[in-house]
């Protein structure tokens, strides 16, 4: 039997369906999500929860003329299925396939790209204001999850919406089911009243009557009584205080009610907020039972939901276990996360030291300033935030931590590629945006044991210090029971010969690649030293000077953009020393890197043994030719 889903090539195909057909389509979409993501991985739970909601939005509105702005946009898979990308959906999050987030370059239906939380309302407001200025009539709908409302940017937007536009629809997708069923039932009943256009007319008429009857005092009393009732029955009076008309909460899985509600909201001449209750993971029992796991995950069994074990500890797990160890050693150690306890591994720390664990929500700036405050009172805060999300905290890092030289530790998970999540999540910029800040130390471990040592070093350091480490598993180096401190700014000489022609300075996960390059050179009769840089700042100037004066070429290798990175730091020091030693830099180019498997992406962008050797041979050949020419000139 043919699926309805197979006939959906654009939102126009959704609009011709009746309610029973839409409900059937919702079931088929869930089956498609479960099947495809079992192979590719992705954000299964959030997308299972927004199927009916997305169907209703496309049934009522007209993209791409109307604009849907998804906060984070990890819950946009259903939107992609309905907007001409159904045939490509099986390749989502695979090389050359659909991105797991919204991309303006991917489809005209994707009006705004995203990957970080809290951006939807500000972007949607910008679109609405631009529309108003040119006299457009398109609708702008911002869809944000309840987690986005822990993000300060969302409230900055809310504070401006009512003052800057009269037509904007905000959908609050509440998938935590935190509202009691009885309260929800009363609110739904009230919502059937307030979504009737006659309600606003009667409401305003009653207001005018009360004003004539008893003046403004009576009107103010009536409004206070209304607000008091709302505070009991409606949990979101704050939105109306900010100038948005609040509707809800309503079920996010009742497609008929959603359609009716959106049709009504289209007629409103003021900013509105619709509060929708959805169930994350709906339609897949394993996702309902383990919502954290199925928020975002790799491939899994589509029947049981079981995922394949990695076989060894990830860097995040090593970080978490080391944090527990450090907290046992030092009562001043505290841990902070910005709504990512599972992703950073701090969910292992929390049960062991609950009074020293702080989840501040999606509030990276607050996390850093909060840590600064803790540090002023003698505590040792470790702030665990993905490299890509720490970008949001640059001003507090400079102004509140480094300027005051406070001993805050920044633990930057995903400090490298983030694989299938793509450019919004790759952590390839932190060395560049942190290296120029006075007082800050920046470390990069080559393996799991060195990560533990660096965290121990950070605990003892009396000043701001950062450590970046990659996603996933490391080389499998055992972690010793007692970590040791590493002297600040001291690189590690891993191998060298009596007459090295090449010195390879490598950072972090590229140290093994450097050793492979050295082995290949050895096979060609070229001796090469390999140095584990360990510090992006301060770099080991003495080591750089020694090899800058003694070798024919230096190679730098980093899992980071070349602009302003570790290689740039080495070049700067050589320049300061007046040395002109040729430098071959290996790292990521000055562009945003697409999603894909890390090994494949590195090969594509030349972060490989072969490409490094090719570039190095050219430099060595040129150097040899210069020596011959110099000798001939002297003769």
What is each of the regions a protein language model found here?
Residues 260-263, 295-296, 314-329, 345-351, ...:
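Glycine-/acidic-rich phosphate or pyrophosphate-binding loops and their flanking alpha/beta elements
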Residues 43-164, 315, 332-333, 337-338, ...:
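Cofactor-binding active-site loop characterized by glycine-rich and histidine/acidic residues
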Residues 218-286, 407-412, 431-481, 608-635:
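Structural signature of the thiamine diphosphate
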Residues 66-67, 270, 278-390, 396-406, ...:
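Non-catalytic terminal/interface segments that mediate subunit docking, oligomerization
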Residues 87-100, 163-177, 198, 358, ...:
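A glycine-rich helix N-cap at a beta->alpha junction
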Residues 299-302, 307-311, 419-421, 440-441, ...:
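Peripheral docking tails and interdomain loops at the edges
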Residues 1-83, 238-259, 268, 272-278:
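N-terminal amphipathic, basic-rich helices that act as targeting or association modules
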Residues 175-319:
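Long, well-ordered, tryptophan-enriched scaffold segments
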